């Protein structure tokens, strides 16, 4: 709707301007401060300029009123125009708030957790954010592909195999073992050890078989990770292996050398990342010739940046903040525009239950498992709460609040609005087709404002995507639900003179809730279950 109104205003003003959304919809649905920017050029007061501009909009079908207020030009949308938009939305509900197909393309890499154990709650935040960003981008018309980079090489995979070997020796063969400083623990390691022992037999468990054991366990963990993601309604398009890029390492090093991006010192090869804003240079090849994790990651990013996407987006844990300058430096040395590599950081999550820290999982050792939290509160509540705050800010929440059936639980509160609307239609004995002819002319000011809010979803979605600020969607839904509940409590619906107008208004509110919830990966309920 905002883009339609913007274009209508531009036809008359014939100049550049910005369109704002005033908080108080009783004053205006949209406003522009254009008069202030023209004041110096026209040598007039903003109030006079705004009054002159307002006079150009007399008898315009889109606007109920256009007024000059304190130098601002305030626009109120007409009921007739809102009704036209309502008819379009209700006639094609699956297309409501969708964007036209766009040329811009994106590749999102996210989750990419080491396949050394089940997903924990820290992984879950980036996973939910990435999946919702994907749903939103595709809804708005962008080509948006997703990828999981499987770290299936290096020391962490070896440690997985070693941890299973030591568990077999200690818990099954009852040998005395000495654990290294770093190893994987938890019930899942013991379970893997038991399964591996049954599969491979006693003779297999020696140090020379650690790589084979690690490979077997890595594949098992990747299957488990995919199951964890599916439980949270997350599907990633493709999984790419770190190992598959090893053969391309030498060619990448040659390219970096050619562009003076690397140098040799102390028997190591260094990335000259300090030349591009990093705090120091980074080792990419060790003295023994083995590549560091950064080396493989540079090869992978070179491949991603070469695939023709307009932008490559990564979602990383906040602890990877220092990794950004070195990766952008490598891409610049390789001839890419580092602005086309966008990094979104997912901050830490703290969980409480009844005000106390949530207990760590015995299955995972020192972590809270994503699957455990979903088992307690469901994937809908998990997804909502992870999207309720900006991704790069710390999030703390008490899962007990998400199990309540009252207004303190936002998922319940919004779902209750959606279910309430279905209940009202059932009570009236009507369906949406029965109210399509209603013209909405009887709506009072609060009703018009509620209708405007419901129809304004697309503008919210565009803002959320462009700013990567997905919390705008749950914020919108909370406000919409609150305004609906208030309006419902203050207005008689079934049996009223304007019953059809009100039911048509409510159907738009329900459509907005259902659409926005769907983009968040949440199912809108038609009936509340107790």
UniProtKB/Swiss-Prot annotation:
EC category: ligase
Compartments reported by the entry: Cytoplasm
Keyword annotations from UniProtKB, A to Z: Aminoacyl-tRNA synthetase, ATP-binding, Cytoplasm, Ligase, Nucleotide-binding, Protein biosynthesis
GO terms, molecular function: arginine-tRNA ligase activity; ATP binding
Keyword ATP-binding: yes
Span(s) of short sequence motif 'HIGH' region: 113-123
GO cellular component: cytoplasm
Major localisation: cytoplasm
Stored PANTHER family: ARGININE--TRNA LIGASE, CYTOPLASMIC (PTHR11956:SF5), ARGINYL-TRNA SYNTHETASE (PTHR11956)
Assembly mode: Monomer.
Protein name: Arginine--tRNA ligase
Source organism (scientific name): Campylobacter jejuni subsp. jejuni serotype O:6 (strain 81116 / NCTC 11828)
Lineage: Bacteria, Pseudomonadati, Campylobacterota, Epsilonproteobacteria, Campylobacterales
């Amino acid at each position: 709707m905002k883009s339609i109104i913007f274009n209508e205003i531009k036809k008359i003003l014939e100049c550049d301007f910005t369109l704002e959304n005033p908080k108080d919809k009783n004053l205006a649905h949209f406003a522009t401060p254009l008069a202030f920017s023209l004041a110096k050029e026209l040598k007039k007061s903003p109030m006079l300029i705004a009054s002159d501009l307002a006079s150009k909009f007399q008898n315009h079908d889109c606007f109920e009123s256009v007024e000059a207020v304190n130098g601002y030009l305030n626009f109120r949308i007409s009921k007739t125009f809102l009704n036209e938009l309502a008819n379009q939305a209700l006639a094609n509900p699956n297309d409501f708030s969708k964007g036209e197909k766009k040329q811009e393309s994106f590749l999102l890499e996210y989750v990419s957790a080491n396949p050394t154990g089940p997903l924990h709650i820290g992984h879950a935040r980036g996973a939910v954010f990435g999946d919702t960003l994907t749903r939103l981008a595709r809804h708005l018309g962008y080509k948006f592909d997703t990828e999981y980079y499987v770290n299936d090489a290096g020391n962490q995979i070896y440690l997985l195999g070693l941890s299973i070997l030591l568990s077999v020796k200690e818990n099954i063969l009852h040998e005395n073992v000495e654990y290294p400083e770093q190893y994987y623990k938890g019930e899942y390691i013991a379970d893997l050890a038991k399964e591996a022992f049954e599969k491979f037999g006693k003779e297999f468990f020696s140090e020379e078989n650690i790589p084979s054991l690690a490979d077997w366990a890595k594949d098992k963990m990747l299957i488990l990770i995919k199951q964890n993601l599916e439980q949270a309604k997350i599907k990633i398009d493709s999984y790419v292996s770190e190992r598959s890029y090893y053969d391309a390492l030498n060619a990448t090093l040659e390219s970096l050398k050619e562009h003076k991006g690397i140098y040799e010192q102390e028997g190591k090869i260094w990335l000259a990342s300090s030349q591009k804003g990093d705090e120091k240079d980074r080792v990419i090849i060790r003295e023994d010739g083995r590549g560091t994790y950064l080396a493989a990651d540079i090869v992978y990013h070179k491949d991603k940046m070469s695939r023709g996407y307009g932008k490559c987006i990564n979602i990383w844990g906040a602890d990877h903040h220092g990794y950004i300058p070195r990766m952008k430096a490598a891409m610049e040395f390789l001839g890419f525009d580092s602005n086309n590599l966008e990094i979104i950081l997912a901050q830490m999550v703290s969980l409480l239950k009844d005000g106390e820290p949530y207990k760590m999982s015995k299955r995972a050792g020192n972590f809270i498992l994503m699957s455990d939290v979903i088992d307690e509160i469901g994937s809908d509540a998990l997804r909502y709460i992870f999207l309720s705050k900006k991704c790069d800010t710390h999030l703390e929440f008490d899962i007990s609040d998400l199990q309540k059936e009252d207004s303190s639980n936002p998922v319940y509160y919004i779902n209750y609005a959606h279910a309430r609307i279905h209940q009202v239609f059932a009570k009236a004995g009507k369906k949406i087709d029965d109210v399509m002819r209603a013209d909405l002319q009887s709506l009072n000011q609060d009703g018009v404002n509620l209708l405007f809010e419901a129809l304004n979803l697309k503008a919210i979605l565009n803002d959320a995507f462009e700013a990567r600020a997905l919390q705008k969607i749950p914020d919108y839904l909370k406000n919409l639900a609150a305004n609906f509940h208030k309006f419902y409590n203050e207005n008689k619906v079934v049996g009223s003179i304007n019953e059809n107008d009100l039911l048509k208004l409510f159907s738009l509110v329900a459509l907005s809730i259902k659409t926005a919830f769907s983009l968040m990966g949440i199912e809108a309920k038609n009936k509340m279950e107790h």
